[in-house]
Amino acid sequence: MHCAKSGDSLSTTIIHLLALAYGVPFVMVGIEHFRDPQKFVDIVPSYLPFPLFLVYLTGLMEIAGGLGIIYPETRIMAGRFMVLFLLAVYPANFYMWTNDVPFNGTRLTTNGHLVRLFVQFLLIVAALGFSGDLQKIRRN
């Protein structure tokens, strides 16, 4: 995905469209952290302090990461940031799974949690692609 520096305008356009498709949902979910924080507070693991603060912080990070992916000038750094961010927030998803915590009133089945884990993995791989690091890993 890092081929945006090449002169190929079609591949550059595709990269920009993929970046929009990846970044916009993160921005939207990040905004939702501020519009309805309680549904996110409910999934913060009980062992973490200051759940409302963490919800606002992760919302801000999702907005920043999503925007960073969208803009070519910040895409490499944002891709690396998103890898770390997605790894850092997965414990909330795991907490939901192991404690049967509903999100916004919905409890996921084991299969639902497995799908969510797989999607998290795909989001990390995509972030590695946007950063250019996936191509480096594949070359080695």
Kindly label every feature range from the protein language model.
Residues 2-140:
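Membrane-interface extramembranous regions
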